[in-house]
Design a protein with these regions (language model features):
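N-terminal amphipathic/basic leader segments beginning at the initiator methionine
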Residues: 1-27
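Non-transmembrane, amphipathic alpha-helical segments
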Residues: 3-7, 43, 173-178, 202, ...
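Short, charged, amphipathic alpha-helical segments
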Residues: 9, 139, 143, 208, ...
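Hydrophobic core segments within long, regular secondary-structure runs in both alpha-
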Residues: 12-16, 89, 142, 146, ...
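Hydrophobic alpha-helical core bundles mediating ligand binding, dimerization, or RNAP-core interactions
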Residues: 15, 23, 40, 120-121, ...
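Mobile late-domain/C-terminal helix-loop "cap" segments
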Residues: 264-313
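Short, amphipathic C-terminal "tail helix"
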Residues: 304, 310, 316-337
């Protein structure tokens, strides 16, 4: 048993080393898919915060369990799942860059990117099932893992479905945020870690109660960065969400706050893609700001974050787990990328 208690940076390094070893083994076993595996490795090396592995890891440690190679392997599997999700998301959005590098879609087209994403998903399944936990623990964790996969796909579908609705409501947008990112990014990773640890149901419920508002706050921060962030830090153009016509909470709040010609302009231009000029982007961003939608979204984000902190304080955790989850809460909501 070891007392190793990694910082977020140290944990990322450990997870990345595990991913590199895992992919090297898969490349040796399946050389025919070598190009696809190299592409998965390229995407992982491009960056990413590794928040999903971190929440899984600390969901496990929250139950009083020590650091182990098995939990690192399980946590790392969630980064492979995330790779699947973002590669397919880039296809649907026809995105050219992510994390400051070309997307798989931009490099090889739809067929190549589909196969990269599909293989990442298969590898994610392999990694979590090969993590050396007892079968009962794996069964409980895989139930949460299965929910995670289903929810991100359902959320993505709703996101695509709403793209043609200029009058999407805030309630609808929040539902998509919870499914597409909130539960998938935080709540389910915590549940997977807790299940692997055999955590009591009271702790599992407490972690879920903490993760739910935090997950939604995480997505709201992502939406704000997509419009008002610094592209040199986010790794993607800050006009991409506007050109693609993202129907997120920020959009819904703006539409609800505008009226008359301003509202007509906003709904007509938002999502107009390559037809938008630089002045149109500035105009749309200004409408989002002057309508009060940006401030209202920030206010909702802060309220959700406060709820998450309050629920975290009520959990019976040791100092290491509490400190790590507090740091992850800040990382999820105060980030600039």
């Amino acid at each position: 048993m070891t007392a190793f208690s990694p910082t977020l940076g140290e944990l990322r390094n450990v997870v990345d080393a595990e991913l590199t070893d895992f992919l090297a083994g898969r490349r040796a076993a399946l050389p025919e898919a070598g190009e696809l595996i190299v592409e998965i490795q390229r995407l992982l090396e491009a960056g990413g915060k590794r928040l999903r592995p971190a929440f899984c890891y600390w969901g496990y440690r929250a139950a009083g369990k020590p650091h182990s190679a098995a939990i690192v392997r399980s946590a790392a599997s969630l980064e492979l799942l995330h790779t699947f999700a973002i590669v397919h998301d880039d296809i649907m959005d026809q995105s050219s860059t992510r994390r400051g590098v070309p997307t798989s879609f931009a490099l090889g087209g739809v067929s190549f990117a589909l196969l990269v994403g599909d293989l990442a998903l298969v590898f994610a399944d392999d990694a979590i099932m090969a993590s050396d936990f007892p079968p009962p623990a794996l069964a409980g964790a895989f139930a949460a893992y299965s929910r995670m996969r289903q929810e991100v796909i359902a959320g993505q579908f709703l996101d695509v479905k709403m793209a043609g609705d200029p009058l999407v409501t805030e309630e609808e947008a929040r539902r998509v945020a919870v499914l597409k990112s909130g539960r998938y990014s935080i709540q389910e990773p915590l549940a997977i870690g807790a299940a692997l640890a055999g955590a009591p149901s009271a702790l599992e419920d407490g972690l879920a109660g903490y993760g739910e508002p935090l997950g939604e706050a995480f997505q709201l921060r992502d939406d704000l960065l997509g419009i008002f962030g610094d592209s040199s830090r986010t790794g993607k153009p800050i006009d991409s969400d506007i050109r693609e016509g993202k129907r997120h909470v920020l959009y819904a709040k703006t539409v609800a706050s505008l009226s008359g010609g301003e509202r007509d302009d906003f709904t007509r231009l938002w999502g107009a893609g390559a037809d938008l000029g630089a002045e149109d982007i500035v105009h749309l961003r200004e409408l989002t700001e002057c309508s009060g939608a940006r401030a209202a979204t920030e206010g909702l984000l802060k309220a959700l974050t406060a709820t998450a902190y309050e629920r975290l304080r009520g959990l019976p955790l040791d100092g290491d787990a509490r400190g790590a989850l507090e740091a992850l809460t800040r990382e999820s909501t105060d980030r600039q990328s």
